[in-house]
Structures are given as C-alpha cells and as structure tokens.
A protein has these predicted regions:
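Bacterial N-terminal signal peptides that target proteins for export
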Residues: 2-13
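Extreme N-terminus of proteins, especially the signal/transit-peptide cleavage junction
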Residues: 3, 30-36, 346-347, 394
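Short linear sequence elements within intrinsically disordered, low-complexity coil regions
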Residues: 8-9, 129, 426
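Bacterial N-terminal signal peptides
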Residues: 12-24
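A generic, residue-level signal for flexible/boundary positions that often mark functional hotspots
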Residues: 17, 44, 118, 367-370
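Acidic, metal/ion-coordinating pockets
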Residues: 30-317, 376-380
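Solvent-exposed loop/linker segments at secondary-structure transitions
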Residues: 47-49, 91-95, 109, 228, ...
Length: 432
C-alpha cells in the first residue's frame, strides 16, 4: 500500500511554533526540494454558466468567459496542470436549450482546455436520448472535447441509441494520462442521491463503493507498469456537506487507493482540503464562482505534500477571454433562432424591472419560510393555468414550488429573458 504524508497542517503548526520560539523560518524551510510537482485545476456544478451572474452587492461573478482567462493564467504558471470537472456542466441557463443540437457545454469545456469531466445527474435532464443527441452533436462539431469518464452509471443493453453515442464519444470507466513525468488514473462516479435526482435517466446504477473498488484495482494494475509517480483521482458526482458527512466521505473511508476526490453535486465550497485516511477531498462551489487549484509535490524520499490549495474567485477583477466571448456570441443567436423565436423573445430583451433584489440564490432555502421569489413563481403557475384554460378556467386552490428547482434570483434593476430563464432552468421531469 502506498503511504502519503499530507502534512500541510502539521507544517503550518510547526512554523507557528518556530515563530513563537523566535527561531528563523529558514529552519522550517530546510526540507528536501520537490522532485515532482502536480497541479490540478478543477470545477464542478458549472451548470451552463457561460455568462456572469449578479452577486449580492450588485456586481457580477462567474462565467466561462472569465473562467477561461483564469485557466490560461494558471497554466502559464503550471504548464503541466490538469484541468478536471466533476459533472453537472449543463442545465442552468438559456444555452441548455441547444444542448441536444449543438452541445455548447462540451464545446466550451474543450475550448477552455479541460482534460476530463464526468456526468452529473443534470446531464440527464433531457433523458437518455437527450444526452445521446448531445454527445453526437459534440462529436459532429469537430471541436476539441474533454474526455468523459463514468464507471457506475451506464445505459442498459436495450438502449442501443445511448450505447452507440457513448461509444462514439469514447466514454470510458477511466483514463490514464501522463503529464510532467506523473501518471494519473482518473475515473468518474455518480452518487446514490444524484441517481435518485435523475429518475428518468434510464441508466443502470452500480453502487459507488463496488464500482470504485473495481475501477481503482484496474487503474492500479495499469499504473504499476510505469515507473512514474502516480495519482488516482475520482471525479465524484456524490458530494459532502463540508462538515464530515456525505457520500464522498464514506467513499474515501471504504475504498483504499484513491488519492484525490473532486467532489461535486452538493455545490459545496471547501476552503481547505478534507483528509480522510490517505484521501483528499476538494470542492469549489457552484456556477463557476471559483476555480479550484491544488498543487502537490513529491520529495526525494517519496513524501507527498500539499504545496498550495486555492479557490480562486471568478469575479469582476478577471477580464473576459476574447476567444470564449467569441464562442459564446456564436451560440447566442442559435438560442434565439432555435428556441426563443417561437415565443417572440430575444436573449437580452428586458421583460420587467425590480426596485429591490430578491433573495440571493446563495441564501435561498437556507431556512423554512415564505420567500418572495417562490411566491412569484407559484403565482406564475396559476397565471399559466388561467391563460391555458381561458373561459374554462377552474380556480386553483394553491400552487407549490420545490426549492430545488429554483436555480437563480433577480438583482435590483432590469430583468431580461435570460435572467427569467435562469431562475427556473432545469430540464424535463416525469411529466414531460
């Protein structure tokens, strides 16, 4: 069994002790120089956020256009960095309306240089056929695309359309990559709760622990053929609560050999990596709010150390990347012509204004109480029924909105078509 020393915390404690004792920091710094260094850049739960979102202070955050700039900057500093994503890259903005026909999400990840991603539950919001169509559209685009890994969530033998699309794209349980003298085994998992949140996916679910044990063993057998130092990374769409509970904590406890879990699905922000045995767990929040960066080093005696861990804000201080802006501008007219035109709407058309900001999505549903945005959406359901039934309208007694389907909010000022769509932007359910 490989034993690694994740000693950032102990190093910090030692440094503080040396300072308290009046000893020079050079005594602490006299450790073996790193022989190898590995940087992993990561995201998850980006949910189609090509464009920035309004923040609580009236500014903006996130967006692929700014994320692309940060990725380029980080790769300039770390040329051998891997760029990984832990799923739910779709469903969250108007760009999802061309998901099955143009695959803008995978084209965007490819344009930003992502090496590998996995599938989250929202990749199945348009069901198995929607995903199959998206995979085929991505391949047909001829654009650079990330590898997709998925070890425990697959089409049944009867779903030939999905099987053919998955094979055509090249979805595998895992991939082996070599970068900067280091070998990486990277695999993907769908969590149990995430599976339950995709009831219409039509996929076959293998328990995560069983799938991980099987896949890690296969990766280890391949990595043993190389003399390179290695890392086994799990792109897990399972999640944690950030406080010691969650499926990814249990995964780390149950499966030996996973060095790093990039934990998606729960939209958790982990300010520091969580260590469970010899496994690190990291998370970078939702909607491209942050770009995660983890740097590890190996010393001559084989010790592995956390050199750096950052959650880099994707905020207004980051300039938009011209190439990603160009790609976004190419997709926006397709959204208008293929989806919005039937409603007589434009992407940035102003529909209304509000003098106050609604509850920020980061604070929404944190406690059980009435909410203005929820009331507005519930009222819109009743209005839609009135419009549909006309003279035959039967009064509705009440309307209910599940908090989980509310995905955005309104800042003070103008409300555009795009803003309105983002608020309730998930795909189809059992009712169509």
């Amino acid at each position: 069994m490989r034993h690694y020393m994740w000693n950032r915390l102990s190093a910090l404690c030692l440094a503080l002790c040396l300072l308290a004792a009046g000893l020079p920091l050079t005594a602490f710094a006299a450790s073996p120089s790193p022989v190898y260094e590995s940087t992993i850049l990561f995201t998850h739960d980006t949910h189609d956020h090509f464009l920035p979102m309004p923040d609580e202070e009236g500014g903006e955050y996130g967006g692929y256009t700014r994320l692309a700039t940060l990725l380029k900057q980080e790769r300039e500093a770390h040329p051998d960095a891997l760029t990984l994503d832990a799923g739910d890259f779709s469903m969250g903005s108007l760009f999802q309306t061309i998901y099955a026909t143009h695959a803008p999400e995978l084209q965007a990840l490819g344009a930003m240089g992502y090496d590998v991603t996995t599938l989250g539950n929202h990749e199945f919001d348009y069901r198995a056929q929607g995903l199959a169509d998206m995979l085929n559209a991505a391949v047909d685009s001829g654009s650079p695309l990330p590898a997709i890994v998925q070890a425990n969530y697959k089409p049944p033998e009867s779903d030939t359309a999905s099987l053919e699309a998955w094979e055509r794209y090249g979805i595998q349980d895992y991939v082996i990559l070599e970068r900067g003298g280091i070998s990486y085994g990277i695999f993907g998992l769908m969590g149990e709760e995430a599976d339950s949140n995709a009831p219409m996916s039509g996929m076959e679910f293998e328990p995560t622990v069983e799938a991980a044990q099987r896949t890690v063993a296969a990766i280890q057998a391949e990595l043993e053929q190389s003399s390179n130092p290695s890392l086994i990374i799990c792109l897990s769409h399972s999640g944690t609560d950030g406080k010691g509970k969650g499926e990814d904590y249990e995964l780390a406890k149950a499966v030996d050999g996973i060095d790093l879990i990039i934990s998606g699905h729960t939209h958790t922000v982990l300010e520091e990596p969580i260590q469970v045995g010899n496994t690190l767990i990291v998370s970078a929040g939702e909607y491209t709010s942050y770009l995660g960066s983890l740097t590890l080093s190996w010393s001559e005696d084989g010790q592995k150390t956390i050199q750096d861990y950052r959650l880099i804000p994707v905020d207004e201080t980051v300039a938009a990347d011209p190439g990603m802006e160009q790609l976004t501008n190419r997709f926006q007219p397709l959204v208008e012509s293929e989806y919005l035109a039937q409603y007589g709407l434009k992407f940035d058309q102003v529909l209304a204004t509000t003098q106050f900001a609604f509850t920020p999505i980061s604070q929404f549903a944190t406690e059980q109480r009435e909410d203005t945005l929820g009331n507005l959406i519930a009222d819109s359901y009743i209005y839609a029924v009135q419009q549909a039934e006309g003279d035959d309208y039967v009064p509705v007694d009440f309307a209910v909105v599940a908090s989980g389907v509310i995905r955005g909010s309104f800042a003070a000022g103008e409300i555009t078509t795009s803003d309105a769509f983002n608020v309730s932007s998930l795909g189809s359910g059992a009712d169509g």
